[in-house]
Amino acid sequence: MKPAVIVSAGAVLAAAAVVALAQASGPQASAQELTFLGQPVTAEDLRLGEAVYVANCAACHGADLEGQPDWRRRQEDGRMPAPPHDASGHTWHHPDQALFTITKGGVGAVVPGYESDMPAFEGALSDAEIAAVLAYIKSTWPERERAFQAEVTANDEGGS
């Protein structure tokens, strides 16, 4: 093979690898594509949500939304570790209203008697801050997960 052909093939492979990596990491959804509880999400909402997440959620759910290790296995006290909020977790399986209710009132607000290390954020965060942090989390999901969660939310709201 000629050196020029080898260099050209290498450049094509390198470009393909860059595109594949960019698609795998997935860009954050733009604010124009997102809604939360039926309301459009703004870029300002996403900035607020990220700040609220870092200050109130990342210590347990991870700086990269990765959750705690072995999050599917009960701890010695019988409680579950903090789950991831990225695509590897189950947050995107739940409608907006359930996510809001859990964050505001604690897991016990949805599952009476359930004991969790996650506090209720009512009184600590405003409704707008809770909505913003959940919109931020949604913005990090790949398109497939966002679309699934949007359908779950629409069905929960009596939509299609």
Regions found by a protein language model. Name each.
Residues A43-E44, E50-P81, K104-Y114, T140-A147:
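Periplasmic/extracellular electron-transfer cofactor-ligation site
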